Each structure stands twice: as C-alpha cells, then as structure tokens.
Amino acid sequence: MKYIIVTGGVMSGLGKGITTASVGRNLKNKGYKVTAIKIDPYINIDAGTMSPYQHGEVYVLKDGGEVDLDLGNYERFLDTELTRDHNLTTGKIYQTVIDKERKGEYLGKTVQIIPHITNEIKDRIRRIAAKSGADVCLIEVGGTVGDIESMPFLEAVRQMYREESPENIALLHVTLVPIDSQGDQKTKPTQHSVKELRELGLTPHVIVSRCKKALMESTRSKIALFCDVPVEAVISAHDSADIYEVPLQLENEGLSNYLLKKLILKSTLEDTNWEEMVIRMNNCTGNVNVAIVGKYTHLEDSYISIVESLKHGAIEIGCKFEITWFDAESFDDDPSEVEKLNGFDGILVPGGFGERGTEGKMLAIKYARENNIPYLGLCLGMQLAVIEFARNVVGLDGANSSEFDENTPYPVIDLLPEQEDVVDMGATMRLGDYEATLKAGSLAESIYGASLITERHRHRYEVNPNYVDRIEEHGMIFSGKNKNRMEIAEVPSKDFYFASQFHPEFKSRPGRPSPPFKAFMGAMLKKSKEKKDQ
C-alpha cells in the first residue's frame, strides 16, 4: 500500500480537501485505484449532530455514515463510494480505546496517548486502506499544524513514516503564500509552517502553495531553499475559476508525476475524461436562473452537494446557471417577499430540520406550483410540498408535520414508527441507501429510466400513509415508494414538479449527474427559452 499524507499549515480553509481529491483524481487518471481517508480532530463521533454553520453540509454515505463534506468531494472527484470508516474523528478513536480498556484488552497497563491512541489511529488507517483494495490511500489530516487537537494524529503519522518503507509514503503539505501591499508573494508563513511541522518529526516531500496568482519562479526557488525540497516539489496551487480545474492545474505543475517517482510507481493509463468534462463545462452556453430557498443560506457550504449536482446537470445538457439564495425566514416575516421569485426558471427547496423558516419555504413551493415554475424539493422540501398541497389543494386547513406541531389536526407528515422510542440524536435517523420502486409512466420513471432505484436518505419523519389516498385524489401522486413509504411526490399537471424524500445530490458525479438534477436543469432551460420566445 502507498500512502500520501496531506497536512495543512498557516490557516484553515486553504483547500486541503480539494487538493487531496485532485491528487487522487490525477492518480486515478494514471491507472491507479485510489481511496481517501479524512481525519477530523474533533471529539464528536461523527458530523451528524453538528449545525451546518459549524462545518458546512453533513454528507451522507451509502452505509448511512454522516461525515465531513470533504468526503463528498472525495466521492465526486474519485467517482467512488466510501464508508463511515473513512472518516476518522478523535471521538471515534477515544471511544474505541476506552471501550477496549473497560474490556481489559490492555492487560492492566496505563492507557496513554502513546502508544494506545496512536496505535489505534495507525491500525484504523491500515485496516481501511487494506479493505478498500486500493493501490494508493490518501489521508487528509484536518485542521492546521500546531493545533493541539491534531497532535495525536500527527504523531501517528510520524510513526507510520518511520515504520513504512520510504517508497511507500509521501507527505504533502499545503500552505498559504499571501501577497503584501506591494504585490509581492511572501514565503515566511510557509517557512514557519514547515519549521513547525519539522519540530513534530515530519519533513514534507511536497509543498503545495495556495496563492491568488501563479507562483513566481523566484518565490518557488525561495520556498525550495528554505524548506529543503526540490524546486519541482514546490507546487503552485493558485486560484482557479472552478474546483474541477484544480486537478488539471496540479497535473500541469507536474505533481502526480513527482509523486509517482517518489512512490516508485509508473503511469499505466492516461485517462482524459476529466479534462474533456472541464472543456465541456467551460464551453457551456445559455443560462438559467435558479432560486434556492433554504434555512442555512448564509453559508453556501451548507448546500455544497446541491450546488455541485446542479453543476453536473448543467454540464451534461450544456448550459450555464446562476443561483440566487433566499433565506426562507424573509418570506416568513413578509409573505409579499415571495414575489421576488418571479422570473426565475426554477425553484429548489433543500433539506433541513426544525420549524424555523418552514412557512416561508411553503410560500415558495406554493408560488412554484401556482405559477408552473419547475420545482425540485429534497427531503424536507418534499415534506413541505405535501403539507402545502394538503392545505391549499386538498383543503386540510391546519395540516402540518408533527415535528412542527404535535397538535395539528392533520399530521400529513409524521414520525417514522421505528423512531418513536429513540432517545439519542446521533446516528439514529433513517440513514443511507434504500430502494424505491417507481410508478410506470410517471415523471420519476422517465427521469431515471428505470423502475427500481437506490438513493441515500437522512430523515426521521415521513409522509403519513393515512393521508396518501386523499392527497392523490386531488392530483399529487406518490410515484416512488419503499413498501408503504412515500419516496417521491409529483404533480403531473405541472411541467416539472418533483420532490423526493431522499437526497439525490449525494450520488451525483461529474460526467454522471443525478437524474433529478439533470431533469430539473433541462426543465429550467426549457422554461428560459420559452420566456425568451414570448
């Protein structure tokens, strides 16, 4: 097994995740099977109970793992499926070690950071890498070198570096090269970051320098001199117009070839599919405008998979798109604000939890339905679509979800039966892959081109089956079902009205877009052309 460790210095948010994913993509293009592990040094067991404002979107894996959004980038760039084990957290490691201590597995020894915690980290990494069957395992260490939370993980990496053969491990350090008021690129932050890394016993083989513009040769040479790496190992990772251009940029910098040389590997393939996809993306014509009405719109990373899925659909049909974000609470406060949705080619309501903003979202859904604007609802976006339809079309005044109103006279959305006795919040929802059978002749079947699909879920509430017949009598049909569970709602009388209990955005890939997002993008493009022809 070959290991590539990715660390970061100077500050957080430099793009270690995209760098890791891009390195992996380029190695895959060279013919190697790649897997990736994300280390998050927080004490939470997983990301499932975190607010999106803390770390952005909670990404859901096929096995139901609720993980850091970086694993979404790994899956999209590598076109692979990971598991919950691929996200290591301090909480998971400590919980395992404490459980072992309680079982007496340490034979009465004093349990310490070294060797017990570090051994558990190393064992996890090696076990995950071996189980994946990959040729190369990328390991991104979250946080910044110097953070106290990261110390046990960096020590484990140091030990791995000592234990593995030199040709089996490479250390890649991502740093920042800022520009001063005179426009000069400054190397001091990088020098100090590498110095701090060395104090921990780690010497980087490659330095990836994040900067606004391409590194000047003088800057590159200075970093090489003071950080003791070859000039060709100083990589310019300057700002790109789109994250999908980063693998091409790093390839042009010679990074993958340098890593192959370090790891004594040979290129067995030159896959150009990624490059061709980027060319198609940059040659898209036409434009559609989509309104996203959500609860966490102040941080776009809260909906990163949705944005990327829209991009995948747009690339596939060859159009550009622009997103306008709307805070659903603004519609709560002033319902007339919903008129701002006039003129959009499509409206999307994403998932979420809690009552805040739900009435505003339903105003947006109603506006889409009444004005025949293409609508895509995801998870809560489906539940609210059902509530809105029940209130305003079926005539069930006061219909609601029991999540928001326990005393509603018409609980058209209710708690999943298996959730009734659940007390803990973490990892207790209906999570991960579940199948859905699609109704023949429905929009859903035409979108997927199949009668049976598998998608990822994350919810505690569902459409109450006691109201299904009554709702369907008035024109909304449930075209996707998992036994007696409603998975997809659509209104056939509208040009495009599709809402799913699942999250199709988690399975969308560049070059292989999620069917609902591709169809939604197509419906918006059609709407845009119709407006121009009027």
From Swiss-Prot:
Pfam families: CTP_synth_N, GATase. Residues 1-265 are annotated as: Amidoligase domain. L-glutamine binds at residues 53, 352, 380-383, 403, 460. Mg(2+) binds at residues 70, 140. Allosterically activated by GTP, when glutamine is the substrate; GTP has no effect on the reaction when ammonia is the substrate. The allosteric effector GTP functions by stabilizing the protein conformation that binds the tetrahedral intermediate(s) formed during glutamine hydrolysis. Inhibited by the product CTP, via allosteric rather than competitive inhibition. PANTHER family: CTP SYNTHASE, CTP SYNTHASE-RELATED. CTPSs have evolved a hybrid strategy for distinguishing between UTP and CTP. The overlapping regions of the product feedback inhibitory and substrate sites recognize a common feature in both compounds, the triphosphate moiety. To differentiate isosteric substrate and product pyrimidine rings, an additional pocket far from the expected kinase/ligase catalytic site, specifically recognizes the cytosine and ribose portions of the product inhibitor. This is CTP synthase. It comes from Methanococcoides burtonii (strain DSM 6242 / NBRC 107633 / OCM 468 / ACE-M). The lineage of its organism: Archaea, Methanobacteriati, Methanobacteriota, Stenosarchaea group, Methanomicrobia.
